[in-house]
Amino acid sequence: MLDFKGKNAVITGGSRGIGRAIALGLAKQGANILISYASHDSEADEVLETASKYGVKAHKVKVDQSDPYESIRFAEKAIETFGKVHILVDNAGICPFEDFFRISVDLFEKVWKVNVESHYFITQRIAKNMIENKINGRILLISSISAHVGGEFQTHYTTTKSALNGFMHSIAIVLGKYGILVNSLEPGTILTDINKEDLSNQEKRAYMERRTVVGRLGLPEDMVAPALFLLSDDNTYVTGTELLADGGMLINLQ
């Protein structure tokens, strides 16, 4: 069993979906957690309440990650709260489905700032804290299968997920000399709020289920085990890697 006792973990977008599942998975194994969230106070409170049952410290910070300066202040708040940060999960992301020809500059920039720019500067600040405290930290960026495949109504989103992987590759090189391992997790089609409306079309949902080789779409909880391994001290040599967790969707071309 992976042990995170005494570790301090920061998870962006930790009030719902994959971020929530990973945050609670870390708390269950002994990590103190601090989550960012955008709007849903009651959901963030529920995460903290559940985490506290595991005997760990749990904190929340409300953040607008479309504002890079607010994202930087969030990172500084996390450092102020914990002193030392051992784990960072860059999870927060948005995907407002839209036709390519209708995507405005404002919409593109908002998706870019939340999905890429905020994580760039949060990671920069947290990684510096790890180095200053001589922590062999772990950083995980939540990318997507969409970094490898196109989406008719996701041209802005797929762009950001490819960029996130490029960022991950580069900082894995930068931070390796300090004992900090950096990877990305690429979920397939997961049943979360981000695609709830899209998958309300039963025909579309059935098609997506058939595309997997396991015969079902993923749940946020399916992402916990691979994430926790990459974030654990048991991971001693995996860095700069994109781990695809998609139920076999990408390989299934039939």
From Swiss-Prot:
Keywords: NADP, Oxidoreductase, Rhamnose metabolism. Gene3D superfamilies: NAD(P)-binding Rossmann-like Domain. This is L-rhamnose 1-dehydrogenase (NADP(+)). Optimum pH is 7. Involved in the non-phosphorylated metabolic pathway of L-rhamnose catabolism. Catalyzes the oxidation of L-rhamnose to yield L-rhamnono-1,4-lactone. It can also oxidize L-lyxose and L-mannose, and uses only NADP. The gene is rhaD. The active site is at 144 (proton donor), 157 (proton acceptor), 161 (lowers pka of active site tyr). It comes from Thermoplasma acidophilum (strain ATCC 25905 / DSM 1728 / JCM 9062 / NBRC 15155 / AMRC-C165). Pfam families: adh_short_C2. Beta-L-rhamnose binds at residues 144, 146, 154, 157, 189, 195. GO terms for molecular function: oxidoreductase activity, acting on the CH-OH group of donors, NAD or NADP as acceptor; quinone binding. Its EC number is 1.1.1.377.
